UniProtKB/Swiss-Prot annotation:
Residues found modified as Phosphoserine: S372
Family: Belongs to the UPF0400 (RTT103) family.
A Pfam short name: CID
Disordered, as annotated region: 257-387
Bilayer-crossing regions: none
Biological process terms in GO annotation: mRNA 3'-end processing
Entry protein name: UPF0400 protein C337.03
Composition bias type Polar residues, residue spans: 298-323
Length: 387
């Protein structure tokens, strides 16, 4: 008969406070050491769900099993329970009355004295015991959240069936091999092998059928769990999209409000004012036709200041050609070179005429009797251009 979760649970349910009960069930558990992982899982569930007194009995059973394992150098149960012993024992300690706490501490002291578990596990347990005095009962569940308990039981059950089926299959293979090797032996011996082979084969068949049924149920349950999780995932994705839409709308509204504020302050439509701004900055300053700056030539840097009087120390009443100060270099301006030379010639001609008029008598008649210049004299004097 295959070992099932119900079989293990029923065996644990018969546990009582007598030494015979604790020792007897411990021997039965040790016999099924190849199912150590599954039996430990069922023990953890029973510890979590039991009353305070039953929790203490289950811890006594664990103590008996791990101590026998240490003496007999069997590692299956110690290895199977080590990942859970801190949380499970500490949670049981936190949930029981003070009188039972004292007895659990006694079991813990035995583990420390005999080094049943590693030093790290024992130190962690000691710390959890100290914290439990202040924090009370924890929310620990031995095999995950409580809502996962049905799936965990199915997995444990399937694992038990699979191990039982594998174990009986090994027996069937060995018996069948022996049966083939002893074909020439006595018929009575062959009949004995045949009976054993039939019995083992039927047991193996039942184990595999139970395993297949349990695994199919587990797959159906997991598929249902996956569908439920997919539905929750879809709802969460829709909620995320809704939140992102709200955030996007808020950002757009803030952007619109900021643009409206800039427009009201005169900084809104920059494209409409860009042309005007460019025209105003690039247009030259307007000048009046009568302004002195309208046609003023540009002056080089060596020209005197407008407020200073140039050449003051060299000014004489009747300057002659010898004592004239040298002319400043011609300034670049709107006049051409030809116009500058004509202006200079007229200035020199005017100075020569003034000197000649000073040398003549005041009442001399330079034009004859009628004191009117002739066209020849005017032409000779340079008043007209060449005809």
């Amino acid at each position: 008969m295959a070992l099932t979760p119900d079989t293990v649970s029923s065996k644990l349910a018969t546990l009582n406070e007598t030494q015979e009960s604790i020792t007897g069930i411990a021997h039965w558990v040790m016999f099924h050491k190849r199912y150590a992982d599954e039996i430990v899982q069922i023990w953890l569930e029973a510890l979590y769900e039991s009353s305070s007194n039953k929790k203490l009995l289950l811890l006594y059973l664990l103590n008996e099993v791990v101590q026998q394992s240490r003496v007999k150098k069997i590692s299956e149960y110690i290895d199977a329970v080590s990942p859970y012993v801190v949380n499970s024992v500490a949670d049981a300690y936190a949930s029981v009355p003070a009188s039972i706490k004292t007895k659990i501490k006694y079991v813990f002291d035995v583990w420390c004295q005999r080094g049943i578990f590693s030093k790290e596990i024992l130190l962690s347990l000691q710390e959890r015991f100290n914290n439990a005095e202040n924090s009370g009962h924890s929310n620990y569940y031995p095999v995950g959240p409580p809502e996962w308990a049905p799936y965990t039981r199915l997995m444990t059950q399937t694992s038990l069936y699979a191990k039982s089926a594998h174990s009986t299959k090994t027996v069937v293979d060995a018996l069948y091999k022996s049966y083939l090797e002893k074909q020439s032996d006595y018929s009575e011996l062959l009949d004995n092998y045949k009976k054993q082979l039939n019995k083992a084969s039927e047991s193996c068949k039942g184990n595999y059928q139970a395993c297949i049924e349990s695994r199919s149920t587990l797959i159906t349950s997991l598929e249902s769990l996956i569908e439920e999780q997919k539905k929750l995932l879809s709802e969460e994705e829709e909620s995320l999209k809704s939140v992102e839409s709200i955030i996007s709308n808020l950002e757009n509204k803030e952007s619109t409000t900021a643009t409206s504020t800039l427009t009201d302050a005169g900084f809104g439509d920059k494209s409409s004012t860009a042309g005007k701004h460019n025209v105003e900055t690039t247009s030259p300053p307007s000048s009046s036709p009568n302004s002195d700056d309208a046609y003023s030539p540009q002056v080089d840097s060596y020209s005197p200041s407008i407020n200073s009087v140039p050449y003051t120390s060299n000014i004489v009443e009747n300057p002659s050609e010898d004592n004239l100060s040298p002319l400043p270099p011609p300034a670049s301006g709107p006049y051409s070179q030809e116009e500058e030379e004509t202006s200079l010639f007229k200035s020199q001609r005017k100075e020569e005429n003034e000197e000649e008029s000073k040398e003549l008598p005041e009442d001399s008649d330079i034009y004859g009797k009628d004191s009117s210049p002739s066209s020849d004299d005017s032409s000779a004097a340079g008043l007209y251009g060449d005809s």
